[in-house]
Each structure stands twice: as C-alpha cells, then as structure tokens.
C-alpha cells in the first residue's frame, strides 16, 4: 500500500464531533480537513439537564470532539456538554477520543494563590480524563503548567505563527514596537520581538483586586511608535484600555492590541468602543462578534485542522509551533 492510499484510509477513519460552543470554528475545521461533522444532537431538558445523542456508529473510530471553553451560553454548560460527549463516545466503543479545546476553561485558576483556594484547572483536567478523554489539543494555555495536570498527552498549540504573519502583513511593521501589558507576558512578547527583530517594552501593573488595575508604569521608549500590545487573552479589557492610555500618554503613534482569546465579558465592548485603540485583533478560538470598526480577526482553524491530521496519522505536531498552515 503506497503512502497516499494509507493516508486516505487513515483520514476516512476520523470522526469529527462538535458541541454547541463554537459551531463556526468546527465547520471551518471540517471543511479544511474535508471531513463532514458527525451527527450530534445536544438538548436541554426543562430542568436544564443536558442530553446528548450521536447519530452514527463510532465503534473503533478515531474521534475528535471540538468544544471551546466559552460561547454564548454559560461556561459550565459547555464544560458539562463536553464531558457528556466524551462519555457518550467512550461507551460507543470509540478507539481514541481527542478533545479539541481551543480555549481551555478555568485556565486562570491554575495555582493556589491564597488560603483555601481551589486549583480548578486541575479539577477540569481530572474531569476530562475521568469522562474518557485520551488526548487534549488546546491553544495558548494561560499557564503552561496546566499540561502537567494531565496523565494523558496534551498538545498546547501556539497562535504565535499566525500572529507573526499578521504583524508582518497587516501592521506598520517597520515602525513597530512590541509591548507586554504585564510582567507575566514579558517572555511571550520578548520571543515575538526576537523573531521579528523588533524592540519591546513592558508595562508593570499594580492591582488592588482581580480585574481592576490601579497603576501602570511603562518600561521602554514608545515615542512615535506603532505599539503592538500582545497578550494571551482579553476579558474585561480594563488592562488593555489602561495600557493603551499609558502608551499614548508616552507619545505612541498608535496602539494595536493583539490577543489569542477574545473573551470580552461584561462591559468590555463599551470600553473598547470608547478607547484610544486603533485596532483590536483576536483569533477565533472563541466565538466573537465585536461589531466594532476597529475589530479584526485571525483565523486559526487551519492550525487545528492540521494538528488533527498530523495526530491521526502519527506525525509530529512540532512543525505547527513555528509555522502557520493556510
């Protein structure tokens, strides 16, 4: 059997399932792989219990379940939906079950940062494994140590290659400087700056309580520069907006915010609408409809589609850490 026939046979044994969290992304991954989504019904009873039905055989199949951590419904509903889907595939005799979770739920609760605090990201890892998951694919975990919470393989893909392409082709690249909005993201931004051969700056923020920034101090010169403010996620956008103000006050020409996970909860949209940002860019790891003239999006469905193809065929995914498939 030649390699082409072997690959065709392998692809035919993939089953793609999708929950309700991000149907658009699931459809894009499906189209790029050339594999239709399997028939799945997800319903809620009147008492809000979730019920799942799978409309075709999964026996001895390599199953990939696409379900991101955030959507139009509550995060806990999507998590429970995912767990039930995994369990349904398990008892349907699937050979292998891989969960594709572009935005990992509870990723910010990754450590015991105060007395009696739970490590909820570890709990989610336990739940996924108990339900029957054999492998996890995700992107830009808020804390990379979450991979160590699992006893099964975890592939933490990077949005970085796609972000690099965006910066090179859709920004004032020659006059740009990369900026980290906090010390925690400095390593990420420094790595990007090295690859782009650009300078970078850092904003040190002092918090009084969660989601509330009291003071920001800029380290670096941004005068007359196009500032590319890079972070892994934007939630309430308080940090991004205040960081933008700080940069503009220090003479920046413009500020473009680029994030992997655009959560945009609470009053985030209103903050962005009234901000001095020239552009807010996010990937489609979560469903986003900002309806703002300054909004732009990076499609990461090719990365997930290629990861699925490579994993299924037993190929390395390390190529995706440095290259963005099209």
Swiss-Prot record:
Pathway listed: Metabolic intermediate biosynthesis; 5-phospho-alpha-D-ribose 1-diphosphate biosynthesis; 5-phospho-alpha-D-ribose 1-diphosphate from D-ribose 5-phosphate (route I): step 1/1
Subcellular location: Cytoplasm
GO terms for cellular component: cytoplasm; ribose phosphate diphosphokinase complex
PROSITE patterns, A to Z: PRPP_SYNTHASE
EC number: 2.7.6.1
Binding site for Mg(2+): 140, 142, 151, 155
UniProt KW keywords: ATP-binding, Cytoplasm, Kinase, Magnesium, Metal-binding, Nucleotide biosynthesis, Nucleotide-binding, Transferase
Disulfide bonds, paired cysteine numbers: none
Pfam families: Pribosyl_synth, Pribosyltran_N
Role noted for this protein: 5-phosphoribose 1-diphosphate synthase involved in nucleotide, histidine, and tryptophan biosynthesis. Active in heteromultimeric complexes with other 5-phosphoribose 1-diphosphate synthases (PRS2, PRS3, PRS4 and PRS5).
Other comment: Present with 5280 molecules/cell in log phase SD medium.
Listed name of the protein: Ribose-phosphate pyrophosphokinase 4
Species this protein is from: Saccharomyces cerevisiae (strain ATCC 204508 / S288c)
Gene that produces this protein: PRS4
